[in-house]
């Protein structure tokens, strides 16, 4: 049975194991990196100050420059001086002190003083003690000193432990929990090896050799303790089973050794490299031309045609004039005639131009009554239905001319050419058609069916024309009145800008103009 492997002494700092654990009886120190500013005598005095009996300072050139050998009376004094001198900063230099090796001591023998020789000759007891200590060391470090094997272990021999597995690690953890001294020694070893402390959160599980092992049949369970009196085998069975047992044990040992060697040489798999995403190439122009265009956001809503917004140009030329009179028109004309008759009865005092019935095409034409402006305002306010805004509210809600000049919306304001359609812009987001009907409905006679049909509101809520509206009124007079009164009215915090809508008129050919001239 082999003896357990001896623990290695782990050094701290820059010192080697040989410097901290010298052989017994070693009293000579090798001091390196001595300052060049010091002379040989000063270096000798420095080392003697720390307890050295004899000092040999080497030259300032060569492999061992700025070094010195210091011999101390005993091993304890040498160790004490080493702990004090090692890593000591002196004149900008850091001293490195270690025990002198045997070859260094052979090549550079230290001179011994006469007093030292006398002590050695007078004290033969110390030599006997050292010899006894060396003999004790050989016995202590031998293979089996109880059996007479006092020679040391072969340094080439090494234990071949199986690779770590979950069961082995679980057994080690159980041993740590049951043996407190073992637990403390493991913590000491982790501290010396500069491993992370195990007192924090659980670390990630490293790859185990079990993951790379081929699956094999589990080994048969072994009994923890052999029976006291096992049954004796028969004589006939002994002869036949001896050979098979030897063969099976040899084969099992070989298989186990082969598996252990394979696992020892097996390298863990490398982690799979994550493939980088392919960078998209820039598309060429010819490919972009053939690809179908993505549907724009505006396609989700009905597209307004130019004919829905602007008046269409009329082609120049002779046209046949046709009248398409619907069935509802006679009833509308009857109502208009009844109103005219009522107006005739009221204004019978005013002079009228009488025309012969044979020359009258569509009835009688009467002059406009001359009424004051104040009377018109009263009539308008009285005749307006309750659904529409009053003139006073319009005047209160309008901004002054001075304020219009300061606003950027009214800087380049032009009313445009008069027509029956008006264009309103700078509307707020919350404006709806009913709000515009509430304002511009006061310029429409809702009792007249023709004016009701001609009154049209188109509010643009989306797209490029958002915040604008086109309003069709019965005639140019109503449109001019609406422009004058509603321009600058603040609706939902924003003043409205009212203009006459631009009508697309046909362009004359230059040839026709020249012919006319």
UniProtKB/Swiss-Prot annotation:
GO BP field: mRNA splicing, via spliceosome; RNA splicing
Keyword line: Disease variant, Dwarfism, mRNA processing, mRNA splicing, Nucleus, Phosphoprotein, Repeat, RNA-binding, Spliceosome
Ranges of residues in domain RRM: 27-102, 420-503
Signal peptide: none
Necessary for binding to m(7)G-capped U12 snRNA: annotated segments: 211-380
PANTHER family membership: RNA-BINDING REGION-CONTAINING PROTEIN 3
Protein name per the record: RNA-binding region-containing protein 3
Lineage, uppermost ranks: Eukaryota, Metazoa, Chordata, Craniata, Vertebrata
